Amino acid sequence: MPLIQGQKPTACLALADGTIFYGKGFGATGVTEAELCFNTAMTGYQEIMTDPSYAGQIVTFTFPHIGNVGVNPEDDETANPVAAGMVVKWDPTEPSNYRSAGELGDWLASRGRIAIGGIDTRRLTRAIRARGAPHAALAHNPDGQFDVEALVARARSFSGLVGLDLAKDVTCAQSYRWDEMRWAWPDGFTRQTEARHKVVAIDYGAKRNILRCLASAGCDVTVLPASATAEDVLAHNPDGLFLSNGPGDPAATGKYAVPMIQKVLERSDMPIFGICLGHQMLALALGAQTVKMNHGHHGANHPVKDLDTGKVEITSMNHGFAVDSQTLPAGVKETHVSLFDGSNCGIRMADRPVFSVQHHPEASPGPQDSFYLFERFATSMDKVSSAV
């Protein structure tokens, strides 16, 4: 809830331009600095905080009631929260949900993540929209003592996400196999036993639900680190290559990811499917360029138009960089665009089963309009296999 008049604040959010927000702290104590973004999703705060794509970012939730259903281990998209911090309008109260295994504040505290509640998130969101994703410092001190000048200085000293390869910080340390499928009532998560295709997934910060969707589409998934080479990929003799989501500047990650993708394209006709950062990696490998967005797209209600069918899909998005559609080379077709700002949301090669999308078809959280893309990937592998 907002601070009562006379109540001492226990958290402070300082923007690089000197704007200060005071509120009630929860989660871990300390100070962190990062890029500040906002997310418009009404549900899925746990999935958002554990999405590796949020590395280097403090997330402002525009929906006022966050934490109401608590937390549980099934909703983690990776082992621990990756987002640097959390900003909400109302600090969490006692959770109420049959799946809840704990409180949001305790969960954040045990995982070293700072949060602030009781501030005007509408004002903050407007500031983010107007100024672009600002750099910020977030502090939580139960004593209520803050060196505001030092916090502003820390916000100003944050290097930003441009030029940062964050995929290397969130990728897996070694390869592993994934066979867990999507959650379904009443059994929950089940194991895949009848795979049709072998798929290598490159982990630039892969969400668990993406891997579940691949498994549910009949893929026997082997996950490799972001630094995997073309030789590493081809050694598994896969039927398809998947490029995952992830954080940071695609141009920085592309320094080692792009040569791998280009070599795979040269040496194999296997289908390739990319999501989010994987979409940007594929675009760079095909000769396009990426650009930093003003405040990015973060939410679960983003309309995207499929240019092939004219269909509009409501999607989940989480990206601060975008593919510049004006730089797409001949032979690469733009397939999807955002209906918010016209930015690129999908590409495919004209003569090969190679495609990618900027949005998140796996949702988690969000709508399921784009689940068909996983089946499209599986179908493309079926066609290649039958042609051999």
Where are these regions (language model features)?
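Short, flexible hinge/linker loops that cap or flank conserved catalytic cores
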Residues: R191-A195, E266, R348
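Active-site-proximal beta-strand elements of phosphoester/diester hydrolases
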Residues: K198-I202, T315-S316, F355-H359
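RNA-binding accessory domains that recognize and position tRNA/RNA substrates
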Residues: M1-H236, G248, S364-G366, R376-V388
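Residue-level structural signal for beta-strand termini and adjacent loop
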Residues: G25-G27, P64, N318, M349, ...
